Amino acid sequence: MFDFLVMDMAQEGERFDWSWVTGRRDRLLDNSDTVHNAPASWRAWLREGISGKERIRRSVVKLQTAPTRDQQPLARSKEDLALRDIYGFYEGRKARFEALAADVVESRLRRDTTTYRKGWITPPGSDGGADFIGRIDIGRGFGQVKLVLLGQAKCEKIDTATGGNHIARTVARLKRGWVGAYVTTSYFSERVQREVLQDAYPLLLINGRDLGAEVTLMAQEAGFRSVTELLKKIDATYEERLAHRQPEEILTS
């Protein structure tokens, strides 16, 4: 029986330097003459041996994660200005950001042709890990499937990764057949992304860049002259959308 170890080549940008192999075929050269062209994972293997195999193992999940730069809008872009408007608007009253987060999830899902039913916002201090509730419908009539969507909203510093403990708290609330949504003005660390992917959590992640882009589109489609006008309209509905209800109640509403 053989175990195969596929080594990571992230440091090389997934590009293999064949000059290493060519050098190994040259009888006049030994390993010390050619190893500098080898992938970093191979050099680590020579140094550490089998004890370092998990660190150098290729991970498909790692390839699916997004680096921080891809989760933050470009400086002075429309998305960047929108994101900063959002953060400034809710500064000092971040609980009210939940109304915007709920609407962003609704807009995002419907834009992807998902049938979504808006639910309610949970009052501050009583959410237990859920800031807003919605429902995803699949199919029609007798055979229709209804899924509870449990949402978490975090209006936090744009340049600091969102806390993994908040993600864990959201996931812990998900029951069988539920899906989650996590909306942040910030970004997700690689560790958090890998955990979500490896454990196959049914969790929609919306980072700061996606948030800024979606809100910009929402404002344009609604005919508002600025993002702030949209934020004011949504904020005016906050109190009327609060409700003390169990998430399961969305299935019969």
Task: List the model feature ranges, each with a label.
Residues 10-12, 19-253:
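Mixed-charge (Asp/Glu-Lys/Arg
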